[in-house]
């Protein structure tokens, strides 16, 4: 008898129009994984932030067509994975998209999954590197809302997956040139307190970059890992991407910037990297090259497809592990997904 498999792609979400910016911001900051405070304090803070930041965020989204492109980018990835899986897989399957802070929310997706009536569910985050604030939050929210007894296999991360690394390397090589350049691998930032609490995100970012640099095989490659999108006065991961662009500008080094934790084009790449950070580079009259996100890159889609095939073929039920089929983080990282949901 054929399996019926429900595959769920997790992503952040985003406003479909600038009128939805405030509820999107509220949902984001009301998440306990983002602001770890009890209610009603967290509710009040999320309300205040969403009101205060609404107009500024609307102006940012107005620069890219008044909406987030992440939703349609994720839909393209879903279609690409579906097409590739159909070439290989004999089992019946449907791929669903579940956004954390905008529609379609987990509750809506679970209703659709019930109608499909699968024999198992596979959860695949579109966050290559695990964090309790992204994949962890999405998985916990999904599991809290699901009310059917179906085996669930969860892919927590794939920071060193072979084809994921190859996809980055192939795109970077297309943009390399024989000049005085520095590569900045720019990842979304996190408050340091989250890392100190045992989150493996920055460790996995380093693992990804180390693998890419090794595969690039360029002698004395000048590169740095940087972090962007800082919000608020608390201490965040360093160095900031903005700071490193300023530093490179003073040294008259050209910049090649790689969005290492983003697999879809959205506001942080299209505005922050393409407009705000490019402005800094232009100020110093240095060349600024931004590498595209992986999107529907064939090697990347192959990577996700291969991960799914491996998990479909596993006989274990209620499985939680990395794409490598083993724990890849040292034990000191206590915010591993296995610890969070068990």
UniProtKB/Swiss-Prot annotation:
Protein name per the record: Ferrochelatase
Transmembrane stretches, start-end: none
Pfam families per record: Ferrochelatase
One example of a Gene Ontology biological process annotation: heme biosynthetic process
EC numbers on record: 4.98.1.1
Gene: hemH
UniProt binding sites for Fe cation: 188, 268
Predominant place of localization: cytoplasm
Gene3D superfamilies in alphabetical order: 3.40.50.1400
Keyword Metal-binding (UniProt): yes
PANTHER family in UniProt: FERROCHELATASE, FERROCHELATASE, MITOCHONDRIAL
EC category: lyase
UniProt keyword terms in alphabetical order: Cytoplasm, Heme biosynthesis, Iron, Lyase, Metal-binding, Porphyrin biosynthesis
GO cellular component, one term: cytoplasm
InterPro entries for this protein: Ferrochelatase (IPR001015), Ferrochelatase_AS (IPR019772), Ferrochelatase_C (IPR033644), Ferrochelatase_N (IPR033659)
Family: Belongs to the ferrochelatase family.
């Amino acid at each position: 008898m054929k399996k019926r498999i429900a595959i769920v792609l997790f992503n952040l979400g985003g406003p479909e129009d600038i009128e939805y910016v405030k509820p999107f911001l509220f949902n984001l900051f009301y998440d306990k994984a983002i602001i770890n405070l009890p209610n009603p304090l967290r509710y009040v803070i999320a309300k205040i932030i969403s009101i205060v930041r609404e107009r500024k965020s609307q102006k940012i989204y107005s620069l890219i067509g008044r909406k987030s492109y992440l939703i349609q980018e994720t839909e393209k990835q879903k279609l690409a994975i579906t097409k590739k899986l159909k070439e290989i897989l004999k089992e019946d399957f449907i791929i669903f998209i579940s956004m954390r802070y905008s529609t379609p929310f987990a509750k809506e997706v679970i209703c659709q999954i019930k109608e499909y009536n699968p024999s198992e569910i596979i959860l695949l985050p579109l966050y290559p590197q695990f964090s309790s604030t992204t994949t962890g939050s999405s998985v916990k929210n999904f599991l809290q809302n699901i009310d059917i007894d179906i085996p669930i296999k969860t892919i927590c991360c794939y920071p060193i997956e072979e084809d994921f690394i190859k996809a980055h390397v192939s795109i970077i090589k297309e943009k390399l040139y024989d000049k005085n350049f520095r590569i900045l691998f720019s990842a979304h930032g996190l408050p340091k307190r989250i890392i100190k609490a045992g989150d493996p995100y920055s460790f996995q970012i380093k693992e990804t970059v180390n693998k890419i640099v090794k595969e690039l095989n360029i002698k004395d490659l000048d590169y740095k890992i940087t972090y962007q999108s800082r919000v608020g006065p608390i201490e965040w991961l360093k160095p900031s991407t903005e700071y490193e662009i300023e530093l490179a500008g003073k040294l008259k080094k050209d910049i090649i910037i790689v969005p290492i934790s983003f697999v879809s084009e959205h506001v942080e790449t299209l505005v922050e990297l393409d407009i705000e950070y490019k402005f800094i580079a232009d100020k110093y009259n240095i060349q600024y090259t931004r590498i595209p996100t992986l999107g529907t890159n064939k090697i990347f889609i192959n990577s996700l497809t291969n991960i799914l095939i491996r998990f479909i073929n596993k006989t274990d039920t209620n499985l939680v592990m990395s794409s490598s089929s083993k724990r890849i983080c040292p034990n000191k990282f206590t915010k591993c997904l296995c610890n969070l949901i068990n």
